């Protein structure tokens, strides 16, 4: 998308339709498709940009999540899954090989040529044999389907072995883990009762994975609790010390154990934003010192603001990515529209259950009532409170979250914490863009191009034109 700032007087003339056709501002707004006249060529350009922005819909589901087990050897205070103890019955809480194979067969019937297979839990490495079966069976079927397939395992790394690392290397499997910050904060958030995934273990195994797989194959995210508010700089310093190139500053989700602990570790959207702003300011400061490092939420939103390209983050997609961009295959064979849909089911509400790999075909899974509900409630451009919002091109609908918090998949934006959080963040990103000097612009573009800051000496206007 184009970037163009107006003064208050200029904006008033623009929305009041009082700009003269000969004014330079009129010409510039037209050239950037903020207004159109009877020149159909500009409408064609705008249509092309819009189609590109929504191109994540072309291939349908590209992210396939396999929940290998509900068993876990950690005790995170904010766990959004109804986890089970590591000693729990494997026959009940682990995905079987038969379930895995049926899930893979459903996945491979989809039209997408580029797919990501993501392994989750619980702690997915507690069921490593089935992880291996999913990878090998997927690769065997792909001889016929010719898809581009990537794999990632989301793990606390506590049970990582050399055998696993060898398999990951052999099959190009990336690792995503969790680091909440320095030792005391990480262990406070994630290891109060069970110490298996304590800081020292995670750090040691991050370094093992980086050495075995390569730095670019290991990523991490952090989850924000009230305790995190004290350590915005220390959290980022920890990521840099671990040679992790970016951080995803994640807020709490309204599912699982996180609901029960909300009073002790939770916060308002406004409180989260104040923390997030301190983190982002520090990240930009570090980049100014020549330390290349990105914050994932800002990078995704800048991509939506500054380029015509889509993003793969389900929460910020419209039409919703729930069911249309992601599918979850649960340990028991049930299929869900998203990870959040699966978590909602663990809390006793199966509204967004799509079907079962044992009972349903590809067609009945994706054309059932749950998908119809998601289609009806998942287009932000058509929802009350979104349709007239200036930020709707950069936001998402997320009907599952709104149903979880409001018991209404359409959602009331006035009462929506999702809406409040992203409105605050997007407003701040526009403030950064408005005040950006050349160095800040280079930093932002380095995030979008995933390259070192010092490689970029970019004129933002020219770069936007190139991308469009």
List the predicted regions and their residue ranges.
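N-terminal [4Fe-4S]-dependent radical SAM core
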Residues: 3-4, 24-65, 83
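Radical SAM enzyme [4Fe-4S]-AdoMet core and its adjacent flexible, acidic
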Residues: 189-200, 207, 211-323, 328, ...
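Flexible mid-to-C-terminal extensions adjoining Fe-S/redox cofactors in radical SAM and related proteins
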Residues: 345-468
């Amino acid at each position: 998308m184009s970037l163009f700032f107006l003064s208050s007087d200029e904006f008033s003339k623009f929305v009041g339709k009082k700009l003269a056709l000969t004014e330079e501002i009129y010409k510039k707004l037209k050239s950037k498709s903020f207004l159109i006249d009877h020149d159909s060529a500009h409408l064609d350009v705008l249509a092309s940009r819009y189609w590109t922005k929504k191109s994540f819909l072309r291939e349908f589901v590209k992210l396939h999540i396999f929940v290998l087990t509900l068993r876990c050897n950690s005790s995170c205070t904010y766990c959004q899954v109804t986890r089970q103890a590591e000693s729990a019955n494997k026959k009940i809480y682990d995905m079987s090989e038969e379930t895995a194979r049926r899930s893979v067969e459903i996945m491979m019937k989809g039209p997408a040529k580029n797919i990501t297979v993501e392994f989750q839990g619980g702690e997915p490495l507690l069921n490593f044999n089935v992880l291996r079966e999913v990878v090998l069976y997927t690769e065997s079927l792909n001889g016929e389907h010719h898809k581009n397939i990537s794999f990632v395992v989301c793990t606390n790394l506590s049970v990582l072995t050399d055998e696993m690392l060898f398999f990951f290397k052999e099959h190009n499997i990336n690792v995503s883990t969790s680091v909440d910050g320095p030792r005391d904060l990480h262990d406070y958030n994630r290891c109060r009762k069970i110490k298996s995934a304590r800081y020292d273990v995670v750090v040691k195994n991050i370094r093992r994975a980086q050495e075995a797989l390569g730095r670019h194959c290991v990523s991490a995210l952090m989850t924000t609790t009230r305790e995190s508010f004290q350590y915005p700089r220390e959290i980022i310093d920890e990521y840099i010390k671990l040679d992790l190139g970016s951080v995803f500053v994640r807020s709490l989700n309204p599912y699982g154990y996180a609901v029960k602990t909300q009073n002790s570790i939770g916060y308002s959207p406004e409180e989260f934003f104040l923390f997030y702003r301190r983190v982002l300011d520090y990240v930009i400061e570090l980049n100014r010192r020549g330390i290349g490092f990105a914050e994932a939420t800002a990078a995704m939103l800048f991509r939506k603001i500054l380029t015509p390209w889509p993003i793969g983050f389900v929460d910020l997609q419209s039409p919703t990515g729930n069911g249309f961009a992601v599918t979850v295959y649960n340990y028991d064979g049930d299929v869900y529209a998203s990870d959040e849909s699966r978590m909602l089911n663990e809390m006793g509400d199966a509204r967004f259950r799509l079907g079962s790999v044992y009972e349903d075909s590809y067609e009945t899974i994706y054309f059932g009532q749950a998908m119809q509900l998601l289609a009806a409630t998942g287009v932000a451009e058509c929802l009350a409170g979104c349709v007239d919002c200036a930020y709707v091109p950069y936001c998402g609908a997320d009907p599952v979250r709104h149903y979880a918090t409001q018991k209404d998949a359409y959602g009331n934006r006035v009462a929506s914490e999702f809406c409040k959080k992203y409105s605050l963040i997007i407003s701040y990103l526009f403030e950064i863009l408005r005040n950006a000097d050349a160095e800040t612009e280079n930093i932002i573009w380095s995030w979008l191009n995933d390259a070192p800051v010092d490689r970029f000496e970019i004129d933002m206007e020219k770069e936007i034109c190139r991308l469009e």
